Curated annotation (Swiss-Prot):
Enzyme class at the top of the EC tree: ligase
Record protein name field: RNA ligase 1
GO molecular function, one term: ATP binding
Key words, A-Z: ATP-binding, Ligase, Nucleotide-binding, RNA repair
Task performed by this protein: Functions as an RNA ligase, in vitro. The ligation reaction entails three nucleotidyl transfer steps. In the first step, the RNA ligase reacts with ATP in the absence of nucleic acid to form a covalent ligase-AMP intermediate and release pyrophosphate. In step 2, the ligase-AMP binds to the nucleic acid and transfers the adenylate to the 5'-PO4 terminus to form an adenylylated intermediate. In step 3, the RNA ligase directs the attack of the 3'-OH on the 5'-phosphoanhydride linkage, resulting in a repaired 3'-5' phosphodiester and release of AMP.
Organism phylogeny: Eukaryota, Metazoa, Chordata, Craniata, Vertebrata
Cofactor(s) listed: Mg(2+); Mn(2+)
EC identifiers of the protein: 6.5.1.3
């Protein structure tokens, strides 16, 4: 599969941001909002954002594929967070200082425990070999998704370790105007990050599946390139998001030549998300799920088995797919 950057750290905004003392439209009970100014950030300029590949920011939960127990595994995002005492000290420090980087963390004592199999995200900053928390006091990381995991049941529904495959949504290889849902070898996704989207993820902004027949799949980061973007100016991007069909997305992620990822979210521009009608739901989708090459039968309740029963079917949009079969 074509590979762009992977999400292994918090992505900065393409613009310099400012905090406004107004209720957040993104997070309930948050008494402030983070808005973009008209100034491009130094990080974006240093990464040569003008020559970056612009892609759709897909709204789900971040995942990672890397080896575990001698085979490719799906990993779920799990950030190490400070315990109550350390969090209290950190917030008190932030009220008196501007730079979170000046806070002294004791990584042995200040953080809540995580499973032994937890690993830190690859690109986070380290000091003396130990991961350094980000500006929110979190250490981004990953835990493997075990088969039949209750905590990560929606993650485990989109992979089969027995057959080494994942349920993936991407453009149809022969027609970029059509989406395709297919079984992709996990080995092809090694060291990539992906977004898990679906019925029970992040409020289901794409209207996928139903409570009775939940539907989830993985989308590789960078899978949906954005064409014909306007110039990198605040008002031009605002008009693009508001005024064209392609702009009905959560945001944009720029994949820069040095591997850096830069983003802008609709909320940075004071715009609403989710939307009643998204660009992702404007494209037809084909199911490509012929499982005949696998010797053993799939569990009849698995998504792979259910999709195999509608193999080769074409739907007008993602939200039209039903697994009531």
């Amino acid at each position: 599969m074509n590979r762009l950057g992977s999400v292994q750290r918090k992505m900065p905004c393409v613009f310099v941001t400012e905090v406004k003392a107004e209720p957040s439209a993104k997070r309930e009970h948050q008494p402030f909002k983070v808005l973009a100014t008209e100034t491009l950030s130094e990080k974006a300029l240093d990464a040569d954002v003008y020559n970056a590949v612009a892609t759709e920011k897909v709204d789900g939960t971040c995942c990672y594929v890397t080896n575990y127990k001698g085979q490719p595994y799906l990993w779920a995002r799990l950030d190490r967070k400070p315990n109550k005492q350390a969090d209290k000290r950190f917030k008190k420090f932030l009220h008196s200082k501007e730079n979170a980087k000046e806070f002294h963390w004791n990584t042995e004592e200040d953080f809540k425990p995580v499973p032994e199999c937890w690993i830190p995200a690859k690109e986070i900053e380290k000091q003396n070999g130990k991961p350094v928390p980000d500006e929110n006091g979190h250490i981004p990381g990953w835990v493997p998704v075990e088969k039949n995991s209750k905590q990560y049941c929606w993650h485990s529904s989109v992979v089969s370790y027995e057959f080494g495959i994942a349920l993936v949504l991407r453009h149809h290889p022969d027609d970029p105007g059509v989406l395709e849902i297919s079984a992709v070898p996990l080995s092809e996704l090694l060291e990539q990050t992906l977004e898990l989207i679906g019925t029970n993820i992040n409020g289901n902004p794409y209207g996928l599946g139903s409570k009775k027949y939940p539907l989830h799949f993985l989308t590789p980061h960078g899978a949906f390139q954005v064409r014909n973007l306007p110039t990198l100016k605040h008002n031009d991007l605002l008009s693009w998001f508001e005024g064209c069909r392609e702009g009905q997305i959560e945001g944009i992620v720029w994949h820069c030549g040095d591997g850096c990822l830069i983003k802008v979210h609709r909320h940075h521009l004071g715009l609403c998300w989710p939307l009643p009608d998204t660009y992702m739901n404007s494209k037809p989708v084909i199911i490509n799920m012929n499982l005949d090459k696998y010797d053993c039968a799939f569990d009849h309740q698995s998504l792979f088995n259910k999709f195999s029963k509608i193999d080769k079917q074409k739907f007008d949009r993602l939200k039209d797919i039903t697994l009531d079969i």
